[in-house]
Regions:
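The feature captures the beta-strand-to-loop junction immediately N-terminal to the Walker
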Residues: 33-35
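Conserved ABC transporter NBD signature motif
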Residues: 56-64, 73
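Conserved ABC ATPase signature
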Residues: 108, 133-137
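Catalytic Walker B motif of ABC-type/P-loop ATPase nucleotide-binding domains
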Residues: 158-162
Length: 247
């Protein structure tokens, strides 16, 4: 379990997160939704240490992750940003980068590292492209390769920033089913979602973020009943989690 308590973070003098508290449980997929500029991406960056936190704590086991180095934190948390580079390397080479937090410099991969990387590629369905250039993959398969990189870190928790962006609906659904499967295997998954209906259909819990604060947290059914979607987004959701389209 990952407990985030009263986390305050931002950029220089500009505060973006104002005392965020959230619990991420193993075996659950938690989605963060909210308007643009509400602090969704900043929340993930603050958890992994890319954005500095001015106060609060992030507890895993008996340790406050804020006291750990970025590398030590990467042994516990995998992070996939929304904007990703396209390195000039094979899928296998990129996925092996997920082992970096676990190996010393100069980096030499062990048989165990290669085994873990292969298992990650197999789980995400990209092992048949292992020696292909990453740039040769379709958008959906490329995203699966990036997720394999995260899995190769061998962490309990995955933090994903809008992982379905730029994917067509078929690949969006395929990716969300894979995330559900990973959660059911015991991983805790925290994902920023732009698509409210995907969040409602695939999440165990949803945190609604607005103005740097969590204004509602609960199951998809609780979110739907609360009316918070109408309040925050000015849209209405049907009982089947589809959007009500105004004509």
């Amino acid at each position: 379990m990952l407990e985030i308590n009263n986390l305050v973070a931002g950029y220089g003098e500009r505060r973006v997160l104002s005392g965020i508290s959230l619990t991420l449980k193993n075996g659950e997929l938690t989605s963060v939704i909210g308007p643009n500029g509400s602090g969704k991406s900043t929340l993930l960056k603050a958890i992994i240490g890319v954005v500095q936190s001015s106060s609060g704590e992030i507890i895993s086991g008996d340790r406050n992750l804020l006291s750990l180095s970025y590398r030590e934190r990467a042994k516990k948390l995998s992070y996939l940003p929304q904007g990703k580079p396209l390195p000039d390397m094979s899928v296998r080479q990129m996925v092996l980068h997920g082992r970096f937090p676990h190996i010393e410099y100069p980096r030499k991969y062990t048989a165990r590292d290669r085994e873990i990387a292969l298992g990650a590629m197999q789980k995400m369905g990209v092992d048949s492209f292992a020696d292909s250039p990453l740039s040769s993959l379709s958008g959906g398969m490329r995203q699966n390769a990036y997720l394999a990189l995260c899995l190769a870190q061998d962490t309990e928790f995955l933090l994903l920033d809008e992982p379905t962006t730029y994917l067509d609906i078929k690949n969006q659904l395929s990716l969300m089913r894979r995330l559900r499967s990973l959660a059911e295997e015991g991983r805790g998954i925290l994902t920023v979602m732009h698509d409210i209906t995907l969040a409602l259909n695939f999440s165990d819990k949803i945190a609604v973020l607005s103005g740097g604060n969590i204004v509602f947290y609960g199951t998809p059914q609780e979110v739907l009943k609360s009316g918070i979607i109408k309040t925050v987004f000015d849209v209405e959701i049907n009982n089947d989690y589809s959007l009500k389209i105004k004509k």
